[in-house]
Amino acid sequence: MQTTLLKPKTIQVEQLAANKAKVTLEPFERGYGHTLGNALRRVLLSSMVGYSATEVTIAGVLHEYSSIDGVQEDVVNILLNLKGVVFKLHNRDEVTLSLRKDGEGPVLASDIQTPHDVEIINPDHVIAHLSQGGKLDMQIKVEKGRGYVPGTMRRYADEPTKSIGRIVLDASFSPVKRVSYTVESARVEQRTDLDKLLVEIETNGAITAEDAVRASAKILVEQLAVFAQLEGGELAAFDAPAPRSAQQFDPILLRPVDELELTVRSANCLKAENIYYIGDLIQRTENELLKTPNLGRKSLNEIKEVLASRGLTLGMKLESWPPAGLDKR
């Protein structure tokens, strides 16, 4: 009698629309289609990493229950429209973006000023409409996250109270909009009691349906790995990334911070925090640097300006940093 469970041998990906696809896998043992299909669906809807606007500051606005002269929408509707903008950040976890527009006409997502490593997936999305003489000036904080996080649940260790004028948004980070699955009958030779799993996925464009399935499957594997070692002990690292060599990084990241020609005070503060290379520096956030002893807002602004002149910003993320063999002085 055969005791080995069948594994899927056929995988088909059918593109239904720009951000919609159907993934078909077969054959499964009877019952496994529903078991795995339901697990994938729940993970896809709840656990995918994405990006969302989390805070907004609008010039001349103290709270969300306001209106702006020359803008057709009130602030509440502007914020609702802003939540529909799909962001994608590369090599960083957060960023603050600016939007400044005046003159009659629509305000689009493409009007948001973005650095080279921030992408707006739906640039034609309408945020507001300006009348003649209207003006809209806002700062938008975008963060990386998972699932849905209400604004009331967010905590700021560096700010015990919410500052006036800063509007905290409910953030929906998930890039997956809809998931459904069906199970049909499959046949292998004489066996007709097998399952075929069809998963239909729609995303917001920040991730493809295929990548979403891969990511959700990896999450399930990581979560289930602990059950294979019920005796106890530490689990082996899952897919630990191989260290990257220095040649795989942008050469500017390997230069010492001394080459930024900062003031002596700023340079000494960075070295006291073991920040020796530009690659070390850009991975720190503004809040982290402000906690550095003797480094104030003036020094922080100096650092930001010097980095901006080289096309860099704070809060960037570098995989496998530092490279192998980099001298930590």
UniProtKB/Swiss-Prot annotation:
SMART domains: RPOLD. SUPFAM superfamilies: C-terminal domain of RNA polymerase alpha subunit, Insert subdomain of RNA polymerase alpha subunit, RBP11-like subunits of RNA polymerase. Residues 1-231 are annotated as: Alpha N-terminal domain (alpha-NTD). GO terms for molecular function: DNA binding; DNA-directed RNA polymerase activity; protein dimerization activity. Residues 249-329 are annotated as: Alpha C-terminal domain (alpha-CTD). It is an enzyme of class 2 (transferase). It catalyses: RNA(n) + a ribonucleoside 5'-triphosphate = RNA(n+1) + diphosphate. InterPro entries: DNA-dir_RNA_pol_insert (IPR011262), DNA-dir_RNA_pol_RpoA/D/Rpb3 (IPR011263), DNA-dir_RpoA (IPR011773), RBP11-like (IPR036603), RNAP_asu_C (IPR011260), RNApol_insert_sf (IPR036643). Belongs to the RNA polymerase alpha chain family. This is DNA-directed RNA polymerase subunit alpha. The lineage of its organism: Bacteria, Pseudomonadati, Pseudomonadota, Betaproteobacteria, Burkholderiales.
